[in-house]
C-alpha cells in the first residue's frame, strides 16, 4: 500500500511554528502532488511566508512532519533542499543587485556541476525571458521590478526544481507585467514543475491553479479545487471584495 507521504510530492502534517510566544503556524496540513500548481491564499499575517520559509529550510518548526518525495525534511539545511529539487523564490525577489543578470543566473546553479546542462538551462531561461538575454551583462540592480521578478524566476529554474515555491510574485508589478509573469508560471507548470504559489491576488492565483488552500491565523481553514474556491461566497467576500 502506498502511504500518503509517498503518494504526494510534498506532504505536510500538523506543522507548528512560533516566534517567541506567538504561534505563526498552528498545525498546518498540506499536500502538493507531482505536477500540481497549488495556490495558497490568506490575509496578511496569516502565516503564508512563514510556511514557505519552513518548507525551504530557512526556519525550523516547533513540531510536525514534512515529507518530500517520501523523505522526511525536518532539520535539512536550505542548500540541501535546493539540491533535492525544492526551491523558493522569496518575497522581494532576493536578487544580487551588484551582480550581472548572467551572474545571478549562474548563482542559481551553485549546487550543480554538470556544466553542459547548466549552459543549456541558461539558454532555456533566455528563451523563456528574452529580455534577460538582452540585459545579460547589465547589473541586476538596474533592472525594472518586472525584470527583477523574471530574473528571480530564471535563477530558481537554474537549480532544476521539482517543486518551485513562489512568494508574492506579483507584488509591486504593473498589470501588464503581472500578466506576463503569470503566463510564465503557467508555462513552467506545463513543463511538469510542481508549484506552490503564495499570492496576494487571490483571484489571479486561483485562476491559474488546480487546487487551493486558505490559510488564516496559522491554520488551513479551507481546501478545494481552485474552481470551487473561486466561486465560494466566503472566499470571494474575504479575499476578492465581492
Give the label of every model feature segment.
Residues 41-43:
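The feature captures the beta-strand-to-loop junction immediately N-terminal to the Walker
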Residues 56:
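Helix-to-loop junction immediately C-terminal to a conserved catalytic motif
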Residues 64-72, 84, 117-122:
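Conserved ABC transporter NBD signature motif
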Residues 139-143, 147:
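Conserved ABC ATPase signature
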Residues 156-157:
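ABC ATPase C-loop
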Residues 160:
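Conserved catalytic motifs of ABC-family nucleotide-binding domains
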Residues 20, 38, 76, 101-120, ...:
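ABC-type ATPase nucleotide-binding domains, specifically the catalytic core motifs of the NBD
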